[in-house]
Amino acid sequence: MKFTIKRSIFVDHLNNVQRAISSRTTIPILTGIKIAVLDSGIILTGSDSTISIEIYISKEDESNQLSIAETGSIVLPSRFLGDIVKKLPEDQLTLEVQDNLQTVIRSGESVFNLNGTAGSEYPTLPEIDADSTYVLPGHLFKRVVNHTIISVSNQQIRPLFTGVHFILADEQLKAVSTDSHRLSQRIVPLTMPEESQGKALEINIPGQTLTELTRLVDDNEDIEMMVTDNQVLFKIDNVYLYSRLLEGNYPDTDRLLSLDYNTKIKVDAQELVHAVERALILSHQGKNNVVKLSLSQEEAILSGHSSEIGYVKEKLSLLSFEGDDLEISFNPDYLREALRSFGGQDVVIRFVNPTHSFILTPSEDEDEFNMVQLITPIRTPGN
């Protein structure tokens, strides 16, 4: 096996494939990258057994400066391969596998030898034989993920909550996530495949998969999504991302969302984010990481304290106030992340009482649940 390629192109593709590789894997060969050389191009593969990324580098694309002398396959240690290729002196490299699986990498006057493993020993990626292909615009998909990923749980006790629940039906994509302390929902329009008209698809995609996918796709690219019983495949041009789906029936979260309120405020999201970040300086030093929001017709106060450090109190500027006076306590990190998910928009926050979850929606779409964040308050003495 032997090929020559433009080094900078190879580095970029190696970096993307390495996103799927975990140093904590219990399967030694999965710490490596599989390189398969065909007559028409090269396939790079990385996997942690949950996520797999495969990239095809075509010989026909002249920008790759790819020439193939001999076909074959090899698995090379991911970390060393990446470090070596990044440091090579010239923007052209040659990689050659010898009979004993010794791999020689040459660039300019530099020569590296790496021990490899036969490509045939690398696990085979799943076959995705899907009835339908869903096309998702990259910019829209990234907004959906960025809005919902914040409520994905990092606790493996409830694996289902470590992902985002997707419902594709009725010409729309609905994405929901919750860690039982907060909830995020985003609904966007979707052109359904002809063969899926009148049908609904519900899947649970791991949060890690979605995070890596947003790093691979550009705003102006489309994502093709194909689903089987327990696998999903995302295709972006020459990049293929395979992922296992999370098993289980996601709970009905619609019942948690209501437009009812006793207190409603409208705020500049960015201004409130900055105020919360100032309060975080002290709240992060306390045992419970709690801040309190006090609302009335006269004023709005955000406060927090650490018994060891001190106290912070800031008067807020509201765009509008409606309803009853209220004092409510909550995790400030949750509010900061929720507000950030709306970008620069003004946000409407609805409160029922100090012990009831409160809901954030954009002011321009406040009476719909197309873009929602829900936060559960923290009970404090007096609440």
Region locations from a protein language model:
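Structural preference for solvent-exposed beta-strand-turn elements
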Residues: 1-383
